[in-house]
């Protein structure tokens, strides 16, 4: 057994993200909407470092490990959308999105007693290119009491990733997802209903490995207007989850001297079953909502960790099941009159509880989580003061818990006509912003925490002014939105 203990790293942790979008919209009311967006997403994270002290169980002799990770990507995308209103209460929507993703990942790992004489030096260089096209079309027809819809969607992608360094290899993968559906919506007095049936085909190919999977995707939505007593809603649906290309790739890369990340081209698409029930009530400024949701994943793709030839292998596999049960209550008042001041106070509070069960091929875990939030805002004429606290819910899946920092913020704002100015503070009671990750595996338990001192007591300044001139154009809304952000590179952040 080897024990690893993190050491505070004084080196900077930098991340640059730039999103540059060019949008064109042409709308003729009740006739058509054409929208074109040219997106350019650039990211660069040059200093993602990690320093650790390590020793064998029962030994006092230690060594050090250091990880330097530099990732960058550039992703241009062209998103075209067209909506046309046809005679006899008909309409059609079409969306086509093409995306290129170029990714570079340079990861260096060293073990040493003397930094100038490393005991191990592992380097992983990944140069990845991905091309994808997403096309979707929906037709709708309205009758007096019923609305009919049908549609198709196709997602085609190809990646070419070159892995250099200590374990060089090249991966070329093709993947597609095709789906079609038919839906009926209607209303009978205070009762509304919607039902749809659909089918999804997922396909994957790498070298001689090729798979195709089919998933039935029904949806049921029911709602009942209780009038003065509130509103009741129910929803059930089955949706497919296809493996990511990064998990499917037939590649293995060493994280360090004992851990290896391995792809799995045998991964299968799995089904997600969701049931949700909610009750909402509102009267004047008072609002309340109670919701319950149950999710069940059949043979989900989750992590597996096992020992092979003295090494720890980290690999995604189709496990037995994952399910979660969530209940959440929200109550609030919006724009209440107080001390004779109209629309002076807005106050919301919410709380929830989630229990999750993760059933792997060789593990079984249960995880409980409480979370809550409180928000208050007072407004007088052009001035407003906002305060918020959130105990953020952690994310649990497989054998990993991703932990989030609680969030506190205060903001003072002044708004007049086109001018908006404000000053605020985030995390006023936090010296170190902390996020973490814990792996509760019996084979290889792991816990890490990342601190960012600069985030504590962070002052925020906000200034905005809206310029208006010339003729005003009311842009039509975009009814379909598709995008691709998966680079297809094997995940080394475990």
Model-predicted regions and their roles:
Residues 15-45, 66-209, 225, 289-294, ...:
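Face-selective signature of the C-terminal outer-membrane beta-barrel domain
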Residues 211, 230, 240-289, 296, ...:
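Outer-membrane beta-barrel signature, preferentially recognizing the C-terminal barrel domain
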Residues 294-297, 301, 316-395:
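Gram-negative outer-membrane beta-barrel transporters
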Residues 351-358, 370-415, 420, 424-447:
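C-terminal beta-barrel architecture of Gram-negative outer-membrane proteins
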Residues 416-494:
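C-terminal beta-signal and adjacent terminal beta-strands/loops
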């Amino acid at each position: 057994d080897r024990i690893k203990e993190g050491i505070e790293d004084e080196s900077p942790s930098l991340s640059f993200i730039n999103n540059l979008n060019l949008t064109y919209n042409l709308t003729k009311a009740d006739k058509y909407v054409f929208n074109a967006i040219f997106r350019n997403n650039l990211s660069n994270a040059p200093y993602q470092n990690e320093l650790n002290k390590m020793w064998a169980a029962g030994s006092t002799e230690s060594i050090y490990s250091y990880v330097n990770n530099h990732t960058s990507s550039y992703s241009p995308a062209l998103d075209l959308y067209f909506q046309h209103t046809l005679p006899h209460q008909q309409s059609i929507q079409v969306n086509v999105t093409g995306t290129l993703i170029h990714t570079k990942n340079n990861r260096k790992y060293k073990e040493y007693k003397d930094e100038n004489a490393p005991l191990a030096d592992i380097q992983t260089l990944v140069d990845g290119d991905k091309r994808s096209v997403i096309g979707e079309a929906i037709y709708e027809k309205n009758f007096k009491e019923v609305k009919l819809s049908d549609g198709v969607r196709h997602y085609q992608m190809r990646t070419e990733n070159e892995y250099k360094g200590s374990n060089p290899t090249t991966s070329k993968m093709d993947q597609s997802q095709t789906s079609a559906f038919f839906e009926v919506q209607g209303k009978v007095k205070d009762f509304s209903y919607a039902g749809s049936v659909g089918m999804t085909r997922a396909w994957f190919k790498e070298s001689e490995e090729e798979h195709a999977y089919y998933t039935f995707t029904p949806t049921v939505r029911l709602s009942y207007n209780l009038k003065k007593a509130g509103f009741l809603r129910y929803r059930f649906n089955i949706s497919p989850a296809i493996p990511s290309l990064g998990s499917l790739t037939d590649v293995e890369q060493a994280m360090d001297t004992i851990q290896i990340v391995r792809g799995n081209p045998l991964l299968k698409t799995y089904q997600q079953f969701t049931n949700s029930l909610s009750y909402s009530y509102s009267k004047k400024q008072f609002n309340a909502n109670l919701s319950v949701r149950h999710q069940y994943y059949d043979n989900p793709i989750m992590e597996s960790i096992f020992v092979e030839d003295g090494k720890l292998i980290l690999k995604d596999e189709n496990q037995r099941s994952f399910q979660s049960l969530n209940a959440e209550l929200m109550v609030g008042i919006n724009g209440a009159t107080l001390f004779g001041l109209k629309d002076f106070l807005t106050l919301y509070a919410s709380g929830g509880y989630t229990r999750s069960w993760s059933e792997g091929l060789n593990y079984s875990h249960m995880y409980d989580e409480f979370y809550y939030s409180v928000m208050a805002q007072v407004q007088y004429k052009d001035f407003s003061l906002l305060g918020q606290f959130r105990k953020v819910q952690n994310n649990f899946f497989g054998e990993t818990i991703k932990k989030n920092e609680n969030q506190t913020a205060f903001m003072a704002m002044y708004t007049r006509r086109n001018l908006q100015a404000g000053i605020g503070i985030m995390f006023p009671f936090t010296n170190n912003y902390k996020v973490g990750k814990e792996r509760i595996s019996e084979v290889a338990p792991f816990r890490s925490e990342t601190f960012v001192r600069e985030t504590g007591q962070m002052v925020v300044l906000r200034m905005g002014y809206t310029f208006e001139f010339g003729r005003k154009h009311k842009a039509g809304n975009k009814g379909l939105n598709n995008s691709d952000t998966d680079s297809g590179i094997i995940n080394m952040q475990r």
